[in-house]
């Protein structure tokens, strides 16, 4: 197994531990067991718990970017903006898991500064994705922060709902936000 294969294997194992057991239970030993590797074999590629955590966050960002690229390719016009932003909402099990992990990083980074870089990486990725979406509709760059706040707020509310609860209201709210951006662009006053 080459280094890239090992990194991928360990990153995916770390992701499974994160989603199953939570951030506070993530350890080199647990990830090694999940990957079916002896802990000593991770010594060079993932020497610390922080490096394992960073690999899991990188995997999250990579998966998100892949889905966003697919959405953008499928709809390279203004409808792509909606498709891209919908990828940021926990509307299925995969996106719900991603959001649960992200929220745990937010909460725990408030008291553990070592978690801040991982949180910042995920936060900046979402901000960048919002910028990509708004670029498709010709919205002003100043609207990125507002859109990021809207998407984060909708995502948190969806996460707080019981699994399987209707999510149509959040999609309608996102559509209303995009309509307001379009109206603002048409009539900037």
Q: What are these model-derived regions, one by one?
A:
Residues 1-5, 185-189:
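N-terminal intrinsically disordered/low-complexity leader segments
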Residues 55, 66-99, 143-147:
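Hydrophobic alpha-helical connector segments
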